[in-house]
């Protein structure tokens, strides 16, 4: 491919594109100027903007074009390569000259104008024998071609970069720190992104020296984004396929450097923690301690530290140790293991403590004690602890002992079992055989006596002609409930022993005071009014009228009057006019 006649000195990205970032109007002016210069050659907007920026770089740093020693001259390159490649390589230079904006628009001074005359004349001399316009097919091929090879060290430049990070900080062999300064300046700029830096294959020679300088300086206060900006990328897929080894080597070395720095920081932070206080060591935050990948390993280390702490501490400290929160203790995955460790600690605590301490131990909440899965096992252990307390704990007050609730004492199952206590059977041995025999028939064998003793319900069958069995004894309450009842009954009997029970009756006062309640007009009074009031008035009116009618019609309804009336009706000669007309007396007007 023929080398480009463009100058090879390139500005930094922020120097070339700062005005485009600050003022979007400059891009529109550059596009308008390119249309005025070459109206018949339309180009895509990103390409024109970038080529205008490349022309600014060329104008700002005038230098004669360099011809590499390992490349043939322009004529030989055109003869050896295809004509399409030659034109595609020369296309960017033509676009740069066509789309270049005037120095007044770019804000350059008169001195810059004078300095630009030389490079422009040289560029025109190089492009004098070349065609001005390219065909659409070659233009598209030129756009797809991502780079133009030029320079003595093999520096690669992007013809049409795809993002705003198109400017690649190139360097020469004399100054080896150019790339470092460029990347630091770009990291300080607001538009910096850690994953958008571009890798240039021409800089592979200086990567080793740059990495050595970076390691020797070792800036600790550098920003986190600067460490991630060491990831390099290829300029285009073609160079990636051609030379993959330099890119991989550089990326692998940079990754190793980042890992080494992280390990050094972790060592420094771990050494800063005093090894004397092991209890506080578990609470010190170490970088990367709470990550998900290292969660299991950290929990294991925390358990080991907990075991190391448990040996030199006193029993009281061990008792408080169960209440100390350890990192990762309440996670769901380690819940079962934590519960097991808590039980072991509880067993270890039970031996050195006093009986009074054992009595209080049953009331102390242990982590994971009230979980649903371990409820049955905890309940069994609580019952055992309660039995051990009754024998080992010297209760000073019997009154307190009755009111102390032992776990599992008043459950429904235990209440049913202790309905017939052993003490009552031992105290009254004569009652137990009769009590057992009541559930059996008269001629039945006594094999089921043991079963009847433990049965919850007892049924007695009476055959005709048989003598009924004596009534069953009343069910006895457990001893603890009997004690509670006696304690509750004693205060009522000892209140006033001189006063007999018969004299205790209710006395009413002889002076009675009547208080009249005034009903105000309100919701209660309004609720009393309604249609039932009208119905009550109508009912009373109808009853009054019926009573008046019976008073008037009563003499006419007697049997004698009815017989005389029937005789008159049987004689048709009796004129109807002789009948008394008293309709007006039946229903007097009111």
Swiss-Prot record:
GO terms for cellular component: endoplasmic reticulum membrane; mitochondrial outer membrane; protein phosphatase type 1 complex. Residues 486-533 are annotated as: Interaction with SMARCB1. Residues 278-452 are annotated as: 3.5 X 39 AA approximate repeats. Its main location: endoplasmic reticulum. Residues 1-21, 40-590 are cytoplasmic. Residues 62-71 have a biased composition (Pro residues). Residues 22-39 dip into the membrane without crossing it. Residues 439-505 are annotated as: Interaction with KMT2A/MLL1. Residues 278-460 are annotated as: Interaction with SMAD7. InterPro entries: PPP1R15, Prot_Pase1_reg-su15A/B_C. Residues 1-60 are annotated as: Required for localization in the endoplasmic reticulum. Residues 57-138, 154-273, 286-387, 422-441 are annotated as: Disordered. Sequence repeats lie at residues 278-317, 318-357, 358-397, 398-415. Residues 110-124, 203-218, 236-248 have a biased composition (Basic and acidic residues). The modification Phosphoserine is found at residue 135. One of its GO terms (biological process) is regulation of translation. It is a peripheral membrane protein. Belongs to the PPP1R15 family. Recruits the serine/threonine-protein phosphatase PPP1CA to prevents excessive phosphorylation of the translation initiation factor eIF-2A/EIF2S1, thereby reversing the shut-off of protein synthesis initiated by stress-inducible kinases and facilitating recovery of cells from stress. Down-regulates the TGF-beta signaling pathway by promoting dephosphorylation of TGFB1 by PP1. May promote apoptosis by inducing TP53 phosphorylation on 'Ser-15'. Plays an essential role in autophagy by tuning translation during starvation, thus enabling lysosomal biogenesis and a sustained autophagic flux. This is Protein phosphatase 1 regulatory subunit 15A. It comes from Cricetulus longicaudatus.
């Amino acid at each position: 491919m023929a080398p480009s006649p463009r100058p090879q000195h390139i500005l930094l990205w922020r120097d070339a594109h700062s005005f485009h970032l600050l003022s979007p109007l400059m891009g529109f002016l550059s596009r308008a100027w390119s249309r005025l210069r070459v109206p018949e050659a339309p180009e895509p907007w990103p390409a024109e903007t970038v080529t205008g920026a490349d022309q600014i770089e060329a104008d700002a740093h005038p230098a004669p074009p360099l011809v590499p020693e390992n490349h043939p001259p322009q004529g030989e390159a055109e003869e050896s390569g295809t004509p399409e490649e030659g034109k595609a390589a020369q296309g960017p230079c033509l676009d740069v000259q066509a789309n270049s904006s005037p120095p007044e628009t770019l804000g350059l001074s008169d001195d810059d104008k004078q300095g630009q005359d030389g490079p422009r004349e040289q560029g025109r001399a190089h492009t004098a024998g070349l065609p001005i316009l390219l065909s659409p097919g070659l233009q598209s091929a030129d756009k797809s071609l991502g780079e133009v090879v030029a320079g003595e060290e093999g520096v690669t430049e992007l013809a049409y970069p795809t993002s705003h990070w198109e400017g690649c900080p190139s360097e020469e062999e004399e100054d080896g720190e150019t790339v470092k300064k460029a990347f630091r300046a770009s990291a300080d700029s607001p538009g910096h992104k850690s994953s958008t830096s571009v890798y240039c294959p021409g800089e592979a020679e200086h990567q080793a020296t740059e990495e050595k300088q970076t390691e020797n300086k070792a800036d600790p206060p550098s920003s986190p984004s600067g460490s991630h900006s060491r990831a390099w990328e290829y300029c285009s897929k073609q160079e990636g396929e051609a030379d993959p080894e330099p890119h991989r080597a550089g990326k692998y070395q940079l990754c190793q450097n980042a890992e080494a720095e992280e390990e050094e920081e972790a060592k420094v932070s771990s050494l800063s923690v005093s090894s004397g206080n092991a209890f506080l060591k578990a609470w010190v935050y170490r970088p990367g301690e709470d990550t998900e990948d290292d969660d299991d390993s950290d929990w294991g280390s925390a358990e080991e530290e907990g075991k190391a702490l448990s040996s030199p501490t006193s029993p009281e400290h061990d008792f408080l140790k169960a209440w100390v929160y350890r990192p990762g203790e309440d996670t769901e995955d380690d819940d079962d293991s934590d519960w097991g460790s808590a039980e072991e600690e509880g067993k270890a605590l039970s031996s050195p403590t006093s009986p009074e301490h054992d009595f209080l131990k049953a009331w102390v909440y242990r982590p994971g004690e009230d979980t649903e899965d371990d409820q049955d096992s905890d309940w069994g252990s609580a019952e055992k602890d309660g039995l051990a307390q009754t024998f080992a704990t010297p209760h000073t007050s019997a009154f307190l002992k009755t009111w102390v609730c032992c776990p599992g004492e008043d459950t429904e199952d235990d209440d049913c079992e202790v309905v017939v206590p052993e003490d009552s059977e031992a105290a009254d041995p004569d009652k137990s055989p009769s009590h057992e025999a009541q559930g059996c028939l008269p001629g039945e064998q006594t094999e089921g006596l043991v079963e009847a003793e433990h049965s919850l319900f007892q049924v007695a069958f009476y055959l005709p002609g048989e003598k009924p069995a004596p009534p069953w004894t009343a069910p006895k309450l457990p001893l603890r409930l009997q004690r509670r009842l006696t304690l509750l009954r004693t205060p009522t009997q000892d209140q006033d022993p001189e006063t007999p029970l018969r004299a205790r009756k209710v006395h009413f006062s002889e002076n009675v005071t009547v208080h009249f309640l005034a009903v105000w007009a309100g919701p209660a009074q309004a609720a009393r009014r309604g249609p039932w009031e009208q119905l009550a008035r109508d009912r009373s009116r109808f009853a009054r009228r019926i009573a008046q009618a019976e008073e008037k019609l009563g003499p006419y309804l007697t049997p004698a009057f009815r017989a005389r009336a029937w005789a008159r009706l049987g004689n048709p000669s009796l004129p109807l006019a002789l009948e008394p007309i008293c309709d007006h007396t039946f229903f007097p007007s009111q």
